[in-house]
From Swiss-Prot:
Keywords, in A-Z order: Acetylation, Calcium, Metal-binding, Phosphoprotein, Repeat, Vitamin D
GO molecular function: calcium ion binding; calcium-dependent protein binding; transition metal ion binding; vitamin D binding
Recorded superkingdom: Eukaryota
Binding site for Ca(2+) 2: D58, N60, D62, E64, E69
Modified residues (Phosphoserine): S47
Classification via SMART domains: EFh, S_100
Pfam families: EF-hand_1, S_100
SUPFAM superfamilies: EF-hand (SSF47473)
UniProt name for this protein: Protein S100-G
Annotated Ca(2+) 1 binding sites: Q26, E31
Amino acid sequence: MSVKKSPEELKKIFEKYAAKEGDPDQLSKEELKLLIQNELPALLKGSSSIDDLFKELDKNGDGEVSFEEFQVLVKKISQ
């Protein structure tokens, strides 16, 4: 996934993975892992683990990542 996608395209990618289990508007840790493995594999080559990344993105501590929280990752990797 290129981060140069439109907001609508990013939302569709997010929703595709969020719909796999539980709340279709939130990514679980497993859904985030699948999204990164399939769409952003270069992130896994860095020093960040999925657990660390998930903790960083889950700003409200509810155990899931909302689209707004996911956008933090998109902004981070597009810089």
